[in-house]
Amino acid sequence: MEIKRFGRIREVIPLPPLTEIQVESYRRALQADVPPEKRENVGIQAAFRETFPIEEEDKGKGGLVLDFLEYRLGEPPFPQDECREKDLTYQAPLYARLQLIHKDTGLIKEDEVFLGHIPLMTEDGSFIINGADRVIVSQIHRSPGVYFTPDPARPGRYIASIIPLPKRGPWIDLEVEPNGVVSMKVNKRKFPLVLLLRVLGYDQETLARELGAYGELVQGLMDESVFAMRPEEALIRLFTLLRPGDPPKRDKAVAYVYGLIADPRRYDLGEAGRYKAEEKLGIRLSGRTLARFEDGEFKDEVFLPTLRYLFALTAGVPGHEVDDIDHLGNRRIRTVGELMTDQFRVGLARLARGVRERMLMGSEDSLTPAKLVNSRPLEAAIREFFSRSQLSQFKDETNPLSSLRHKRRISALGPGGLTRERAGFDVRDVHRTHYGRICPVETPEGANIGLITSLAAYARVDELGFIRTPYRRVVGGVVTDEVVYMTATEEDRYTIAQANTPLEGNRIAAERVVARRKGEPVIVSPEEVEFMDVSPKQVFSVNTNLIPFLEHDDANRALMGSNMQTQAVPLIRAQAPVVMTGLEERVVRDSLAALYAEEDGEVAKVDGNRIVVRYEDGRLVEYPLRRFYRSNQGTALDQRPRVVVGQRVRKGDLLADGPASENGFLALGQNVLVAIMPFDGYNFEDAIVISEELLKRDFYTSIHIERYEIEARDTKLGPERITRDIPHLSEAALRDLDEEGVVRIGAEVKPGDILVGRTSFKGESEPTPEERLLRSIFGEKARDVKDTSLRVPPGEGGIVVRTVRLRRGDPGVELKPGVREVVRVYVAQKRKLQVGDKLANRHGNKGVVAKILPVEDMPHLPDGTPVDVILNPLGVPSRMNLGQILETHLGLAGYFLGQRYISPIFDGAKEPEIKELLAQAFEVYFGKRKGEGFGVDKREVEVLRRAEKLGLVTPGKPPEEQLKELFLQGKVVLYDGRTGEPIEGPIVVGQMFIMKLYHMVEDKMHARSTGPYSLITQQPLGGKAQFGGQRFGEMEVWALEAYGAAHTLQEMLTLKSDDIEGRNAAYEAIIKGEDVPEPSVPESFRVLVKELQALALDVQTLDEKDNPVDIFEGLASKR
């Protein structure tokens, strides 16, 4: 099929790798492929360097020191697929070469020590933890550094905040009090800052010289009593203020203040914080702490420059500004590598504590590095992070786009981040610095709106964690191909033009150019422009970039469209959209859903499970295909070959399509012929009418795979057994089980069918001596077993596609205590579209299938072509997502011309271009009608008369030209399939790309007759998962009361709910065919009475003569 490209803007640079934020970050943290001597001091290398050397605390023993030399990662013990099957973590063993040095003797012992396992990242940027694919979401937080913000309580006054990395030191606030004293707040304690300045060695003259320009502000520092002290005395005074309960000793005070501001192990601004502080205050720092401790004295790094800036800001000196905390220059991203390293550092600190304890306990001669180190705390910290952290999430792999989006997510929640309740509007809002860095459209709709966002398409995260976006340099009105990646702070210094600025060659064509400076729009001459956007795509995320004609959609609906694409279910017959945006191929390639040739060669063999390619150098390389693999969401991940034997392939050519891809293009739905018109009220309120033909052609059929699992345990009564030998079952019930009792692959199973046979021992009394004798003679046969087999739950079923058995003792299998074996059965279902399923397009138009019409009842074109889907026109104007109309028009042209289109966002097909294509399409459409011997039908002419009155066509023109005029508006005359008469007015018809979403009615349908009850209240449980009932709540009771339906109401509140005695009697009566007896007292009433009695309230039931009556009589015996 021919693909026609629109767009005038040249691609200057390709998109960066879409999973780079994950893959690069983790690679940098592990540095597994870098030789030890060449490793940078980042990631786990930095964590080792910070934690070691570990010195013995008891200095009297001569002193042991454990030092770190280098680390290495071993090979993972199991491949990825085996980890998924056996519930293992895909990880590599970590070894460190350590040295134990005896200080007094100079003896050195060296050892390689095993430090546990570290999970490895798969090629696509996810992890396999306990058999499940997971993604670590990047976190956005306020960058460490020095910030100046207005004091909310006092206008004209400011607070300086010094912020370290999370959990690496205290926040420190400096402010000028109403009485003029400059105070410092740390760990919720306030004291005069002058005290700390004296500790740091400043005297009156120095402060007067450094800050003399700010006259009266400096007076707040000049406390004579403080300057009269020596720095050591000021230190002890400071210590007593901060730790009032501790004895004021010099060494204690030095240790405390050192830990607070100068110890690199306990206080850390991080590289980003150091950079931000230097940039803000215009200084150079020697390290990442606030002060140094040299020769027994504290030396200042940050406090005086911060104070100088605070005074200048208060005095209104030009060039000093408050900070906007939502500016992306002040927020940074913590990617996987950093998050994991933080946990690794915590684990190492625990490990070091254990080493110090062992140094004190053991005899020095017998100690070796291996004996000192216990790797458990480190391994536990890493495992905790990957399996339980709020940022470690179950991977969304509904389709390739969802998994890609999940890896590009940015969350402000999580440890050290915000909470939903605390986050206000400002944090959630779109900020001007989001331009080209964070997508302004894609975010969830609920409580997390604005807190969870997505990285923009071209954005990259630098080493310091700031998001950079690319710009082309402009010199003297000429746009060069030099591309510069800039942070939000750097960008504020320049004048930047938009990507769609008209160019002649490389020179800016316009005399006045719309540009932006610090986020504000300005109109400038070409010579003033310093940079230019690289592409209109750079503003939005990958998902939003997949919406054609995005510029014609309201942002609220574009948000829904972006989010719903990730919920699209991969279909059996996937189709790439007729109207694409140009990113479809990149998404499939970077998500690793499809298979591509790694070198040039020729296809040697193709079958359903593998493709073999003979490379130019004669090597045969096999590419195994993933067939019907169950995703985390239960959709089928399936790869299908797209090459034939003997075909030549180049490096990077497509070998096999993955789920939701067609010839390497993302294919989340189907192109269907849509009519936008009301239809007898069936498409009221966003409901959708579809043609039965879609079901016949399997257009919206998807495969879903459910996993069922059963364990065989050792119980007190004896071991459970997986077996075919199940008591009281007919041979028919067992026909699909193999001799071991597991269902065979290929069997069709329905609700209630056995998937795995299992027997468990019944509880019984102590056997008599005779029984014991019989048992010893005849074996266990004599004991009673009950059937506890795994059966297909209600409303489910399908074809068994795979079974897995894990037995204790098999290599790599780790089962829970008491479990002997686990059997898993995978059952696949083919689901056709049905009433109640949710459909949506890319523009946020979503609805539920309300009616499936026979194809002969659908409206049809004059040539007899029936439409596939009828959408309600009222769904468009108020939602303001007109992109779908333009897509439909362009789709109409594509339908008759047999073309596909690439229409990039903000640079796509314009109205005249669409009209030109529609004119060509009309020639094909009308030419075909004429060729078949019928021109304009007289009933069509009636519709055209009506169109004239509406001003849609030029009066007096020949009907054929009027039809063409309508066609250029994307409208045609449609006929009602039921009556054969034309529909009154012209109707918009065309191809629209529509997806089936993951919310399928089959997963939500549920009915209960008899089922489980809650233990305390004895009322039926709720929810499909518990096989629960429908709650008959307070308002429903009012409804029955209003109608006076007393018997129905009584039945609802007793027999059908928690009247134990009554429901058992009713069950019996129904079986025997007798009348249902009167209900007795509900159990919840008994619970209420018992609770009141527990509160020492004597609740009694009295008859008319005031004699006590036990209304619960008989209830206790039934319990």
Swiss-Prot record:
GO CC field: DNA-directed RNA polymerase complex
Keywords: DNA-directed RNA polymerase, Nucleotidyltransferase, Transcription, Transferase
UniProt record similarity statement: Belongs to the RNA polymerase beta chain family.
Primary role: DNA-dependent RNA polymerase catalyzes the transcription of DNA into RNA using the four ribonucleoside triphosphates as substrates.
UniProt KW Membrane keyword: no
Record organism: Thermus thermophilus (strain ATCC BAA-163 / DSM 7039 / HB27)
NCBIfam families attached to this UniProt entry: PRK00405.1, rpoB
Record's catalysed reaction(s): RNA(n) + a ribonucleoside 5'-triphosphate = RNA(n+1) + diphosphate
Transmembrane domains' residue ranges: none
InterPro entries: DNA-dir_RNA_pol_bsu_ext_1_sf, DNA-dir_RNA_pol_bsu_external_1, DNA-dir_RNA_pol_su2, DNA-dir_RNAP_su2_dom, DNA-dir_RNAP_su2_hyb_sf, RNA_pol_bsu_bac, RNA_pol_bsu_CS, RNA_pol_bsu_protrusion
Name listed for the protein in its UniProt record: DNA-directed RNA polymerase subunit beta
One GO biological process term: DNA-templated transcription
